[in-house]
Every structure is written in C-alpha cells, then in structure tokens.
Amino acid sequence: MQPLLQLQGITKSFPGVKALSGAALNVYPGKVMALVGENGAGKSTMMKVLTGIYRKDAGSIHFLGQEVDFNGPKASQEAGIGIIHQELNLIPQLTIAENIFLGREFTNRFGRIDWNKMYAEADKLLKRLNLRYDSRRMVGDLSIGDQQMVEIAKVLSFESKVIIMDEPTDALTDTETASLFSVINELQSQGCGIVYISHRLKEIFEICDDITVFRDGQFIGERPVSDLEEDTLIEMMVGRKLEDQYPRSNKAPGEVRLKVQNLSGPGVDSVSFTVRKGEILGVAGLMGAGRTELMKILYGALPRTGGNVTLDGRDVVTRKPQDGLANGIVYISEDRKRDGLVLGMSVKENMSLTALRYFSHAGGRLKHAEEQLTVADFIRLFNVKTPSMEQPIGLLSGGNQQKVAIARGLMTRPNVLILDEPTRGVDVGAKKEIYQLINQFKEEGLSIILVSSEMPEVLGMSDRIIVMHEGRLSGDFPIEQATQEALMAAAVGKQYGAKQE
C-alpha cells in the first residue's frame, strides 16, 4: 500500500544536541499509525519538521506522491495535514461554527458574513463525524471531549487527508475516549490516515493498526500492532527490558500517622481511612468517583462540611491549601499545568515556590545561594533533565515537569504526600524513576497517598488500597487481597470481598 505521507531520513540538530537522526514515518490511507517513544525521543520535533515549524537539516517529505517542504503550519494545514494538539486551540466565547471557520468565514456578494452558510457547512462537518449537537452552541458550554471533536471538525474543514492526534485522550473520560475511537474509525472509513501519539499503550493496542517507534531521535522500527506485545514494545522504546516496572519496597509501615473519620465535602460523603508512617495508600476508582475531591478536602483546597482529621494524634483543620502545607500535608495535583506549575517561570522558581520560607532571612530577603544549592541537590536527586535551573519549566518534557512538581512538594518537608495521577502523560522510563523516588520516600518514613486511574500502578506500588464509588468508600484491601477484578468490582459499587471501613 502506498503511503499518503512519507518522511525519510529526517535529521534535525539544535546547538549541542541532535534531536532527530535519520528518522522516518509512514502514514497509510485508512490506517492509524501510532508514534511512540519516551519523552525526548523526537516525536514532537518530527511533527514540527513535518508542519514547517522547524526546517529539517536533511531528509525528504512526500505527501500524496509529491515531495513537499512546508514553510509553516498554515501551508501544511492548507495542503491537507491537520494536527490536533494536546492543548486545545479554541475560543470558548465563540460558537462551534465560528471556531471551525475562524479567519475563513463565508461571505455573501456584499462582503458580509453568510451566517446561514457557515452554520450549514459546520453542521455538515459535525454530521460527518456522527455528532448530533448544533454548530450554534458556544464552545465554552462543551465538555473537553466535545471540544476535541470540534478540533477534529476544524481539521476536516481543510479537507485533511492526514490527521495528527497528540495525546488525544489525556483529559478525556472513558466515555469520551470511546466516542473519540468511534470518530477515528469513521475517519478511517473515509480514507484518512491518522498519526496517534500517546503514552497509553493499552489504547495503542486497541485503536492503532501499526506502530512506529522512536528512541533518542532515531527510527527504531515500524511494526503491525498484531505482531507486537506490550513488553516487546516497551523494550523497543527504552532500549532495555523493564523487568520490574513497579519496584516495590518491602519495608513494613510504622504506626498510624493520619486518621480521617467521616470526612465530607463537595462530591465526598463520610469517608474514613488511615495512613501509616512509611506506607503507600493507593486510592482507586472510576472517573468522577470523588478521589480528587477527597484529597482536595483533606489538603484544604475544597471546603470540609463534616468529619475530622488527626495527624500524629492532633486535630487538623484545613480551610485553605496553606493550612494543609502548614500541617505537613502536600498535594501534587493531577493537572500540573493548571494547578501545579507556572510554565513561564524557571525550574528553580517552580521548585522552591512553596518553600521560600526556608530560604528567607527574618526580614524576608531571600538566601539565594542556599536556594540554589538546595534546588541543585533536588535536580540531581530527581534526575531532572534540564540544561540549567534557569530553564523555563514549560520547555521541559512531561516527565521532568512532574519530577519538579514532586520535588517542590518535598521541599516543604511534609509528613503526608498526596500524589494525584503522578505519572499521567509521563513516558515509561520516567515512570520507573518516579516509582523509585516514591519508594525512597516510603523508606524514609513519609506517608504517601497515591491516587491513580491505572490499576496496575495502584496494585504495583501500594501497601494497601481503598476504592471510591460515587463519593463513598466502597472497598479497603490489604495488598495481598487486592486484584484487578476485586478493585473494579468495588469501583462500580459491588462488594468483592472488600472490607468497608
């Protein structure tokens, strides 16, 4: 089968680093090609070369049988290559139709916008994707999943033959992900070629036909999904076997440190649990079960309406996040870009932001040398890959951003560390490093609460697991009794040998 799009021998260098070296990618009509690799493998650079953001140093790009060299995203878009970024590019205050045709509005012979034609054309695009909502709806009223469908419709309005999806399910619920997969199947039936960039290997094996693997800027291989198993794919991505994906520390937990009794608040109803010193408590459950809300109430980011919390035997009241920090409770958000990090600030500023009191003189003046030494130590400890501590954190990979977010929490010297989806959007190599750090914290006596939607992660890392369902606790499992089936049963509200606290 002739590819719609073919990139061969692509090389791209930046000062001091070769980002791509002889990289290749083929996209076939009616097929979904996964593009996988660790963070820093060159996936994003390859897409930027393809769309003309970066100029390639060597290699060739063929699209629809012709050699092309786009001078920018507008040229590649108009040629029929659409890209849907991880960060959606829509204006909430405009309608669906206005977003789709922004800057390309239909006009009548008097030069005025032909609203009827614009809405009719937008409705046609939505219908092509089997979407039933009206293009007159405001984008701000749509869920993230529906907004993503608008992005796809916008791409189709350019008659795109190749559509690139970058981490498309990162912010989607399971239902929205299923809808996206239906749309992808529809696009395949219309002959579109899809490039699917994701860290979620389960999805890749579900929706993709073929897989292209990059490692350290090089093309490692292209294989049909049917020829690969997950372990083999991971080995191709990281260049080594991940024999022990979830390194477990067998050090026994100590005495109870945190005791939560009948805690209630927005989306949470009378939840009780304990966490011991040197214990990793896993928190499982489906999207919307109230896991994040429970953690935010505990930390002080959401109001508590009932219940009580004791830490090392003393009552703790957290009305705001500062109260949580003051009591040694640190929460690392699931959405590090919205709640956790300031992307325009440096690695150093982000890392020390909540711990500045430890680097301040009595008059409030900063001890800059001490701050720099501590940040440098944490960068080494966490193996943060950055040219310098002054590098804007927005330029780091997802895995390195997450390490900085966790390091910042540790700088405040907490007793309880809450990690909400700590490996979301992080590649398999960086995940292993984060797991090793979590075990190190456990061995040092820190109490850790690990909230995760990835069942293998919760099972692989936790000493004990509680499960949430519709705002209530539906299960409490010692790790010896925890299985994927038991956790899933509790997550949907069935008791499967679970002990209700």
UniProtKB/Swiss-Prot annotation:
Catalytic reaction list: D-ribose(out) + ATP + H2O = D-ribose(in) + ADP + phosphate + H(+)
Domain of life: Bacteria
GO MF terms held by the record: ABC-type D-ribose transporter activity; ATP binding; ATP hydrolysis activity
Sequence positions that bind ATP: G37, E38, N39, G40, A41, G42, K43, S44
Compartments, as annotated in UniProt: Cell inner membrane
Keyword annotations from UniProtKB, A to Z: ATP-binding, Cell inner membrane, Cell membrane, Membrane, Nucleotide-binding, Repeat, Sugar transport, Translocase, Transport
Record-listed E.C. numbers: 7.5.2.7
Membrane topology category: Peripheral membrane protein
Pfam families, alphabetized: ABC_tran
A GO CC term assigned to this protein in UniProt: plasma membrane
SUPFAM superfamilies: P-loop containing nucleoside triphosphate hydrolases
Domain ABC transporter intervals: 5-241, 252-495
Subunit-structure text: The complex is composed of an ATP-binding protein (RbsA), two transmembrane proteins (RbsC) and a solute-binding protein (RbsB).
Family classification: Belongs to the ABC transporter superfamily. Ribose importer (TC 3.A.1.2.1) family.
Role this protein plays: Part of the ABC transporter complex RbsABC involved in ribose import. Responsible for energy coupling to the transport system.
PANTHER family to which the protein is assigned, alphabetical: CARBOHYDRATE TRANSPORT ATP-BINDING PROTEIN MG119-RELATED, D-ALLOSE IMPORT ATP-BINDING PROTEIN ALSA-RELATED
Name of protein: Ribose import ATP-binding protein RbsA
Organism of provenance: Pectobacterium atrosepticum (strain SCRI 1043 / ATCC BAA-672) (Erwinia carotovora subsp. atroseptica)
Highest classification ranks of the organism: Bacteria, Pseudomonadati, Pseudomonadota, Gammaproteobacteria, Enterobacterales
Gene name linked to the record: rbsA
